[in-house]
Every structure is written in structure tokens, then in C-alpha cells.
Amino acid sequence: PDLLVDDPVRLYLAEIGRVPLLTPDQEVQLGRAVELGAYLAECRRVAGEDPVALLRTVWTRFSAGWPVVAEFAAAVGVEQRSRSVLLDRVVPLSAHPPTALRAALAQLGQSVEALEDALRCRRLEFALFPPTLRAWSDPCDRPLPPEPPLAELDLDPDALAAHWRRIQQEGEAARRKLTE
């Protein structure tokens, strides 16, 4: 039989067959870019547009919240050498044995939701760091000072502003790609 032109289901199926689908990895990458851009916007609402103030806000959130991540990692037996690796290994919570997870939550006095949110925020903040700051702060044995080491790393405000713009643009582009 001929294709009925007014059959909406057939028209829809014919149309979606022309649109390339994303792979699961692409969906995850785009979702992370959207989430990172949204978190940057949230930090920007707190800090304003000054790139150094924005970095200080992100740094303060990260350094203040890091002890919870380190305590949780120790409680579930995750090695603490590199903050980037540690953040990848503690998430998702479902990857940890239920008894170890329950014990860690009791030790920390946290709910699953609060801990998941804390871990998610630390991952986002670490991802927001400029590459030089991320590399500087990656070793777990390096104490996190109350202020980011701006002078030590020679972090230029214009370069920081460009870094924030790139993250924002990538987040917006990812959002468009996911909704097209």
C-alpha cells in the first residue's frame, strides 16, 4: 500500500528517520556541559560578573565542601591521591557496597540526597577551575588554602573571563543540541 500522506504516525516516523540520533556518550557529555553551564550561572548570580570574584566563589565552595568528599572517600575505602580521580570514584553512590555506604552516611550524618548533592557540586566546581588551578589543586596531599592561589599561578582576569565565557557557550550549545 502507498504511504498515506495524512497519517501522522507514519509522517512522524519518516521525519525522525532523517534526524541523526546521539550516542549515549554524546548525551552524557552534552548533559554535563549543560549542568556545568547552569552551575556557572548559579555561581555568577552569587559572585557577579567579576572573573576573579567568580573564581573565589567557586574556590570557596569547593574548599569548604571538600572535607565531606574526603571523609566519604575514606569511609568507603577510596584511595586519596588525586582529587580528580577521587571525584570520579566516589560517584555514583550506587557503586559502593550498601553496608559501606550506610556506615559512611551514618558517620557523616548525611542523607543520600545531601551527599549526592555535595559530591555533584564538588565535581562541578573542580570542572570549573581553569586548567592550571585544576592541576595545582589535584594532589590530595596539598592543603586547600582559604583563597585560590591567584598570584602563584599567575591567573589573568582576562583569561579567567574567557574561560568562563567558553564554559557558558559550551553549555548553551549543548542545551540547543539536546533540544533540537
Protein language model regions, located:
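Transcription initiation cofactors for RNA polymerase, centered on bacterial
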Residues: 1-180
